[in-house]
């Protein structure tokens, strides 16, 4: 068809008729788009909502038509005022595209969400929480997201009530700062919040610090020195973003709702939920284990509120009612947790306690004067006052352990099988209730430390709970004795594998007691408590680490027992944390406490840490006297495996005379020194016989002369600890 001809036809309808007349000759059918006349005024384009592909298929169909004439113009003429028959009324109504309902297509989840699943939402979450988790995971890119719902904590955390905490791991320090900055900007822009990012450096501040650090590094390099400052204030590895208080999701106790009308107090109740996002690097998150600490706190709080009996108002207890059965139900020991907030008695109980009888019978000031041993022999003991806090401990320290275990009877509920128990509970019945409770706890602690099979730690924990629920005092001496009982453990070398570590249940009980002592105001950042925990988490025998796969075939080397490498590393991590607590709190140890730590490090084969601790004693100003040096050499003389640190050990011999005051080589020191030299150098006897001229042989001669002088002084009845004064010919 000529393009000029089509160009001359300006009417759209006329042009369509011309095209149809030519196409009909080639047997191609054209279906009309809509009903109506062929007039120019009534012709309109197809609706936009129709599918283009379907219209295209209808317009250009290659199937031949039965009647070519009908296919050319199949639209019948319609007179004015008449409607076509057989068509429904709905087809006449035109629905615009913006009024049609869109079909919701299934959204494809983001690929990052499949790799890093979001934590489940808690009960009654605030509306912002889901979008916040989505933004942190997908847009910011934090990994290993976890969520802790702390809204039920009672008392609430220091960050505020109704708290939800989110934890996330950044890929690096730079990613950490960028993520925190973007999160704060997103919260300000999207939700008009005012977040506070603790630990986040501003962009200009970060540039300034990096520029200063580079300048210091350049100056140090030119001066041929290194930067020794461990913390530059940039790489903290931890940023805490306080989102603030958002709407919805608050937790309210039922009793609070009932008392809301008659609420009397100061301030206003804050409605809403507080959200905090903890962003850390992977190393920092593993180091501080903040998530584990909050999770333990949450578990303790949830277990506390489950069925713990509250103290009831009652008259003061009479002396004869002490041994009656208590009303506290026997529950699982993990549910028997107490805090200061749950043990406050009411007014009647406080009045009864404060005005209770405090008198003591003057004739009952003894704990019995005789004891019957397992062999039937009677031993007379000196009387001791029951009010003395060390009377029981002093009594059982003066007798052998097997006799003490016999005096303690069958167990906790045994009160009359031995003469000691009969007299003990008779005196307890006449004592005030608070003193009687303290004495029973003291007796159980001593029995557990002696590893009596009838006295168990859960029973001791229940007795402590009863003591606390009665609002009795807990002194520091009682707390330390209770802590010793919970941390005491007798290793079982006959089991397979050997049991060398304190069970987790016992450690959990000890931590609960420490937690309660802290709530009562006792100082927990103390050297005594820190050393007890350091020894409590350690192995109770000499060990050496091996791989888990090699453990069944690993023999016992000397006195050292093989243990899994991952277990040994876990113990060392806990010890390292306790050491950092000591350094941060500037806690000073005594010489006896250093000896306990040195023995633990030596038993687990941490020789580098052993010698570092030995040097720290001198830096801390602790006097390394003769007892410490005897302990040092005796420790090495009892075991082997330390031969790679022989130089450090032998260097301690000339160091003794440089101490303040000097430590001279006497007979006792010379004997243990010779044993250590023999272990380190088995050929020392041959060298001495050949009279070789080396420092080791001269040291052997010095020890021999000191031993001979001590023996001669002992034979003459003189002091055997007289120092050995060496001559130049001995060196």
Curated annotation (Swiss-Prot):
Identification of the protein by name: ATPase synthesis protein 25, mitochondrial
Alphabetically ordered keywords of this record: Membrane, Mitochondrion, Mitochondrion inner membrane, Transit peptide
Membrane topology field: Peripheral membrane protein
Family note: Belongs to the ATP25 family.
Known function: Probable mitochondrial mRNA stabilization factor.
Region feature (Disordered): 61-93, 356-396
Ranges of compositional bias, category Polar residues: 356-378
Gene Ontology cellular-component annotations: mitochondrial inner membrane
UniProt transit peptide range: 1-52
Gene from which the chain derives: ATP25
InterPro entries in UniProt: Atp25, NT_sf
Entry-linked PANTHER family: ATPASE SYNTHESIS PROTEIN 25, MITOCHONDRIAL (PTHR28087:SF1)
A GO BP annotation: mitochondrial gene expression
Subcellular location: Mitochondrion inner membrane
